[in-house]
Amino acid sequence: MAYSIANNHLLRKTFTKIKNIIDIPNLIDIQKNSYRRFLQQEGVSESRNNTGLEAVFRSVFPIKDFSESASLEYVSYSLSKPKYDVVECHQRGMTFAAPMKVKVRLVIWDTGKESGIRAIKDIKEQEVYFGEIPLMTDNGTFIINGTERVIVSQLHRSPGVFYDHDKGKTHSSGKVLYSARVIPYRGSWLDFEFDHKDILYVRIDRRRKMPATVLLKALGYSAEQLLNYYYKSEEIFLTGETPSKSIDAELLTLQKALVDVVDPKSGEVIVKANRKFTKASIRKMVEHDIKAVPITFDSIIGRYASSDVIDPATGEVLLECNEEVTAEKFDEIKAKGVESFRLLFIDNLHITSSFRDTLLMDKISTNDEALIEIYRRLRPGDPPTLKSSLALFENLFFNPERYDLSAVGRLKLNFKLGLKVWPECTVLNAPCMFGAEDIASFDELFRLLLAADNRFSQYVLARLPEDFVKVLRKHEPSQPVAEKLREQLLKELNNLVKDPDFYQKELFTGLALSQQTVALTEAIEGGVFEENRRVIEVLRRNRMIFEDLYAPVVLTSPKNDILEIVRYLIDLKNGRGAIDDIDHLGNRRVRAVGELLENQYRIGLVRMERAIKERMSLQEVENLMPHDLINSKPVSAVVKEFFGSSQLSQFMDQTNPLSEVTHKRRLSALGPGGLTRERAGFEVRDVHPTHYGRVCPIETPEGPNIGLIASLSTYARINDHGFVETPYRIVLDGKLTNEVRFFSALEEEGHAIAQANAEVDAEGRFVNDYVSARKSGEFILVHRDEIELMDVAPKQLVSVAAALIPFLENDDANRALMGSNMQRQAVPLLRADSPLVGTGMERIVAKDSGVSVIARHNGVVESVDASRIVVKIDESEVDETGTGVDIYNLIKFARSNQNTCINNKPVVKVGDVVKRHDVIADGPSTDMGELALGQNIVVAFMPWGGYNFEDSILVSEKLVKDDRYTSIHIEEYECVARDTKLGKEEITSDIPNLGEEALKDLDESGIIRIGAEVKPGDILVGKITPKGETQLSPEEKLLRAIFGEKAGDVRDTSLTVPPGVEGTVIGAKVFSRKGADKDTRTELIEKAEEEKLRKDEQDEIRIIRQSAEGKLHRLLIGKSLSVKLEDGEGNLILAKGKEITAEALKSLSINDMGAISVSDDGQTDDNVSKVIDTLNRQIELIQSVFEDKIQKLRRGDDLPPGVIKMVKVYIAIKRKLQVGDKMAGRHGNKGVVSRILPEEDMPYMEDGRPVEIVLNPLGVPSRMNVGQILETHLGWAAKGIGWRIEEMLQKQTSAESLKAYLKDVYGDDEVGTFIDGMDQEELMLVCRRLQRGVSMASPVFEGASEDKIKSMLGKAGFHSSGQVTLFDGRSGDPFKHKVTVGVMYVLKLHHLVDDKIHARSIGPYSLVTQQPLGGKAQFGGQRLGEMEVWAMEAYGAAYALQEFLTVKSDDVSGRTRMYEAIVKGKHTLEPGLPESFNVLIKELQSLCLDVELLEGEDE
């Protein structure tokens, strides 16, 4: 609870009652983990998992040429060190990226002319440069062309199968039509749908629909197989006097008895006619040995045959499969002596005839016709052949290259349909796979070979000798295989493997082969073919053969994916099963950086694959090396385009630390493959029950993107499948445990989950019998024994920004939304001040955002100044390669993406002990390691002379004087000298036609000095550009010849300060081309940088020397010498045998100490030389690192083509608070500063303290954000307690009573112990810090109650109402009523009036219309629209209006006449023709209307 790093950490009094079970996961892990998984930078290729970049390479390679005489295989990839580090990339506008090399192998095959056997002819392996891949910085961002960017995670629809209905809107009858859609990760979409006549149709890729049975027949199923797959059938017996049917318990329970069912022996009636069959009656029938149930003749008529009924005598088909039984047909069947036949069970109540009707209307009967029909639908106009139809169909859903469900899609399909297919199987119609562990023995292979429905076994058995197959077939699969049979089978298989014909056939059409070759090779090698290495040799040589030999472990599943998808859809129609909710988070998943980039790489590699194939076929492959084939340009281009211009690659919002963190945790439903703003409906944007604890229900933008862009909740994380998970505590047998597990939305379904604030006793049992809980999206009251899970914390519901709002529970959600969005726009202030009333999240955000400097190791602070901190690491933490010193170079006044100022200031002092992960320097908007976005301000809620009408804010001048709301903004200006056609541009201070005054701040290189104060129009960098040569008159030529070059051939193109910018130059950077001469300014900058590096180097060496000296002293002092000890000049210091003292060692260098020999067992001497060796090695390491850095510094820069020199100038602008600036609280209460009032005029309290801001009380009730009032009261108490501590210090109260008061305030045993343990000095330090107010934490949904606030007000010595009498600062009279006064945390937002205000007299004009441009950026004018003209007309201001519409706008000649008139002092206005009139005439003429303007003299 209490932090102390040299006691400068804040103690926060917290109001939470719930103990912390699990820390909030690192806030930017979502980005870092995803990219780490994608890059797998650490691993070597063999150990890398098949994910991310590795998976892309493995899936695209090997690339074979068209004749398959050569193949290019992928071996591994490796990344080198990036050329520039993060800081350099920022400065030079480079991309922070690492060069990538890929090792590939080109294998050339030789195919024998006669035998057709392929053998390896040649193998060439080579590392090929494969472009650069951007790296992620430690803070989860990318640096692209010098700017920090964030890749936002995308929330998209998960692959899998989705069932839905049209809610009765499609057909006029209002009938509900069901449909199913299979969405793959990539590949063709498959839709099944019913029409209003209950016929089932299928669409492939949203093409024209066809009966679904066409697709099923194309899979190779006959009509009879399909009917019997989807329908149960009953056997009808015709042997007795009346017909009867078989007893099927499942079907009978759905029916009534048509006639009495009688026990033939006793004559007892078991089931009466027209009574339903029950489970009991069926059991009774079985007990009485009744085999069939009597039925009536009528019940058979109108039913359908489940298979052909055949005349037993002639073999003639009497009744076809799916044909209706009529009276005539029935008589014929009976007459022909058929004893029994089977009918489909369709009762149109539980089971409808829709599938049977579809089969009936489908005119296609064979597999081949179905394939051709599908080809016709997908490729209309192409003449179909059976071969092309088969190839197309195979590629649609069964070819892993064209169709990929992804592991997630397979998982969802298995989950929905209850299948047990291998997760590696990412195509449809997938066979069930046996894992390597399933092939336990040879017997297993045997069983698989003899499995009747295995296409591989059929293929193999057809090629083995017939007599051997007979022997095999006799073998009982459950019995072990005899030795002799085993040998014989191996021999036969071996012959097959050698036989080239074995591989000729298209073996596995429609079978997917798992990519996990390794596990299975081992299984086949280790278990199955142990005795026969020959097979494996062949396998090794030919990967294709190898995959074919996988087939022993392939068993085609009787449950085919597509059949099961259709079955579920039919069940839905029959009233079983449930449709899917596409907004459920189990059906939406997150694609984070890694996956998005993986997809881009795949696109690039596929493009490259085409190019490689073409090259292989065009040139002689045998003479080529891999690098001749591979051109990585397409891949680099795709990646570059993704980072540069993808919708999901965004310019990082760097206004303050919170906005950075939030941007990295954002989830967007937009972007490629996602939704579009215009088409997204209400449902997608709405909050869904599964968002609880996963996606924040509050934080989302206002406007068109509302609900499409969301933010991850505080505890949420993303699992390997891309689903969002949230943690819950496990409840076992009604008792709460401390075990925490993460659940995705699907896993959480059906569990009863208690709220985090449910009351629990000391043993973890729920206090109340009935507890409020969530179950399947509903809030219910559940008995405590039924609770299975419990939330970990109340704030797990909301995102980081919303969790920073105290008393969030008392705000209206719409206002909370504005509050969380506006905190992200708070400008970092000059003096950061952490909130008195916080939520306890401030420290976590500041730490995880990466803006503050965090200690890397435990250690002691050696030295501190404004720009760096040196920490000597504890010896226990120094490893072999480390130097034992951490140097933290602090960032000073750097510019952020939003032009705010990034600056680190140390919070430690020399001698402080720091622990790993401690904050040692604050960043922007952080105070003592806590987020500090605004200021704690004393506010009063009252009207004041109309200056706080409608959300205006009245501010005291004191805030401006004290610089409470002053912020620094840094602008960067760039000047580039290019090589032009007319000559080189030059950066110089020698600029023609400019006086001394204008150039006074430039140095001789033409660059402004640091520290210069600049105004609009001042020159920052002097630059001249050659002019085009003009024709000179003879006189001029003569003069030129006589007087030499005149400055007439260059023009001034200097970089000047734009309008509206005033500030101080704080930095200049010069980049010059390699090989170009350096100017003096560049040399100065380089020299300063070099000195800084040298200082770091010397400090590092000094500290490790000191530490080595310390070690040597500890080793040597107290030991006796074995040889005499002399100094460098030969003077005796200690005689032999004397004991070594600290005094004696003082004058010796480290090397001298190395020469000391001690009389012990040699252990000390060894240790001494070890210390010295380590020291020398570390010094060498440090020196080489710094030499590299200095070399880099002296090298020229890589500049874009045509650029000779580039100068960047940085100007710091100090912005004080002024009228027109936007301010806001944390509860969505925003306003604009309307007046800055002198301090003496502000309302003041009885003790003379004036308030600092006056707010309008009417802004609270209608907006329903009462949280701000509670915050004000609690803040008032916090401030009051601070004042009381100040009083006590002034009165020099005893330490005991101070401690007692503090313990009373904090009321926490842990803090109590901490306070008791303080000495006088520490106590004073803490109390001085607390004078500004005691920091409190009121976490969301478990904040301070009203009673607690009143008790805190009491401790501060205030009235419990929180109201005081105020006096008018102007008259001194008290106001009539008491006023609510307190402390509120108020932010200054990034909408500053200085950035928006703008004025122009003359400026740029549009080319065509000659009207002034618009907008501040273009230095544009003010538009006068239609309505403004009406207003001017209403006033009768005719001349002003004429001026507006002509000379001030687009009357070009009138404009020049106007200038003349002003210069000459005439005040006449002669308007001419506006240019836009000419445009109008030209437009009319372009429409072939002959319009002319006739100008005549005035009559």
UniProtKB/Swiss-Prot annotation:
SUPFAM superfamilies: beta and beta-prime subunits of DNA dependent RNA-polymerase. It catalyses: RNA(n) + a ribonucleoside 5'-triphosphate = RNA(n+1) + diphosphate. GO terms for cellular component: DNA-directed RNA polymerase complex. Keywords: DNA-directed RNA polymerase, Nucleotidyltransferase, Transcription, Transferase. GO terms for biological process: DNA-templated transcription. Belongs to the RNA polymerase beta chain family. Its EC number is 2.7.7.6. One of its GO terms (molecular function) is DNA-directed RNA polymerase activity. InterPro entries: DNA-dir_RNA_pol_bsu_ext_1_sf, DNA-dir_RNA_pol_bsu_external_1, DNA-dir_RNA_pol_su2, DNA-dir_RNAP_su2_dom, DNA-dir_RNAP_su2_hyb_sf, RNA_pol_bsu_bac, RNA_pol_bsu_CS, RNA_pol_bsu_protrusion. DNA-dependent RNA polymerase catalyzes the transcription of DNA into RNA using the four ribonucleoside triphosphates as substrates. The keyword Membrane does not apply. It holds the Pfam family RNA_pol_Rpb2_45. It is an enzyme of class 2 (transferase). The RNAP catalytic core consists of 2 alpha, 1 beta, 1 beta' and 1 omega subunit. When a sigma factor is associated with the core the holoenzyme is formed, which can initiate transcription. This is DNA-directed RNA polymerase subunit beta. The gene is rpoB. The keyword Transferase applies. CDD domains: RNA_pol_B_RPB2. HAMAP family: RNApol_bact_RpoB (MF_01321).
